[in-house]
Amino acid sequence: MVKIGVCDVNEDETRRTVYLLESQMKNDVIDKDNVTIASHTLESVMLDLDDQRFDYDIFITELSFYNGRNGVELAKRINKAAPSCNIIFYTNKIPNELDIYESRHVNCMLKGRHDGRLVMTTGRLIEALMSEKSKAFIKIRFDRNIIILDCREIMYIRVEG
């Protein structure tokens, strides 16, 4: 199962992006049987990251939020918490003061002009995640926390207690 998270400046923008993806799922452009899409506010994503409950495979986010917050800082936190997460910046405009390459992401595109590219990129990511390449990461759930580890960095696992 591939989990996609969407976070935007406001609920209307988030709903629009979710609707765009879901409409393509109905048209069989995106595999609907193995995909779940969830919408978020910036605050709910931050809470999930703080509580170690963030476990999305693909995360689509805006670059410019209110109160001086930005998607690059959010992406950096996601990179640390969930290194296997594929981040897509889907934005109204790319601010000159932001360096989007400070964080690891797979694509950056403008809303409206690149809607088709968002659907195509998301579809390709889903296909890649469903293949064997995605097996390089494991999710460990303990209590209510989720930890995502890169298998190549694990030397051994010791179980205590």
Task: Specify the residue positions occupied by each region the protein language model found.
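Short helix-capping segments at alpha-helix termini
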Residues: M25-D31, A81-A82
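Conserved binding/recognition cores within well-folded domains
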Residues: M120-G161
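CheY-like receiver
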Residues: D51-E132
